[in-house]
């Protein structure tokens, strides 16, 4: 095991604080509408230009081990805030730096770090309650667009696109972000349920222009096993042919004789069919087949439920108004399932979301809810160059997370104003002793830091603006984009409550840990062994007799 370097007390803390400051100073230049860009080097290709706090934080690794520990702890603040609320990473970093800076002064003067932390925690809890009180619900399209615009660095076109997407697919709908092919942003909305499986044979195509198979008013056969023997399918195919309607077969796989027969029938015009593989794998495949069954009002033909293909009747088949099958996707529009059954299924999946432990599972379950309840919208980001597209795509994703957070917990005045107003809840707060009171003061000072940084990035005098905003009431604040004092909510400068709350809680959590640190253990840098003496050996035997 390698030898370790153990550093105690102020020596450990001061080095870690240096790391905190290096990271925070790089991140905080991006805050606000007049925030600056940060250029990130890439080992391959051109550099990346960004105004996203968490992207900057993730790139920073420091040479000094102790400094790097401090930087990594604040990086955790940015990452956690981004994971929980989707935005507010720069605000969280600025708050953490301020709490650490002010707290270190008190620790150096001999105050008890544990009591300081208790005071900080008490103040943050009171501020969070106040934020919840002053929060207002975010319901209208205009408010959703405003939240998206602010989060995308005051780009109103992004806010409008997100509001339009949410309007089309509902609050529960899935909205994804992809690279576009043109200069302008585009919005594609897929109504109904779409899953990523296409036709098993190109001979099923009946619309050559679009290269898709379109089925109007079809039956839907759902089976959880492979279908390779046509005899299994014959009874149900005869019933569908009598009804004179097309058929979509969704099974684990359709192959061999069964697939060949379906293709021949399709080409000859005897029976219009399309076969696709079932989406997902394992247990998720079963669940998705069940979702499709409920959406189309059919049943999954599985041995577990006592149903077999040979005995299947039209009653077990699902139905839909229209189905489009492409090379890679299948879209079921207007399934014939009962609204009550669909609602019950959505409720069931929502319960699973609450119980899910991994982010991946939660995301997949959320997608299932969206496919059952609303639809899927795809925002295609357009830009002139790849560098610009990457930067813009990151901003759109940020804005999307922020709007979801706003719909969830409501909105407060942006531009650092909400934190200034929440200070009123802490102003009269007292701790159990003088050290806890100092902790409360630390948070009071830190809560004006985001506004100070926004104003500083805008090139104005921070102290003057902070005093003017603090003297005002309600949503009165400073709009750094225009340089005017306005009602922030009316001006459309708003933040999701969840973002502001999460930023404050995460910043206080990590800053408290730093303040109460009294020793740091790091690996000693390895010393490379010197090269052995003497000339390196040459290559013998290269002479040639002429």
From Swiss-Prot:
Protein name per its UniProtKB record: Chaperonin GroEL 1
Protein family membership: Belongs to the chaperonin (HSP60) family.
PROSITE patterns from the UniProt entry: CHAPERONINS_CPN60 (PS00296)
Chief place where the protein resides: cytoplasm
Annotated region (Disordered), positions in chain: 526-546
Organism of this sequence: Burkholderia vietnamiensis (strain G4 / LMG 22486)
Subunit relationships: Forms a cylinder of 14 subunits composed of two heptameric rings stacked back-to-back. Interacts with the co-chaperonin GroES.
Record localization: Cytoplasm
Top-level lineage group: Bacteria
Xref: HAMAP family: CH60
GO molecular function: ATP binding; ATP-dependent protein folding chaperone; isomerase activity; unfolded protein binding
Gene Ontology biological process terms in this record: protein refolding
GO CC entries: cytoplasm
Record keywords: ATP-binding, Chaperone, Cytoplasm, Isomerase, Nucleotide-binding
Taxon lineage: Bacteria, Pseudomonadati, Pseudomonadota, Betaproteobacteria, Burkholderiales
Listed Gly residues bias regions: 534-546
EC number: 5.6.1.7
Binding site for ATP: 30-33, 51, 87-91, 415, 479-481, 495
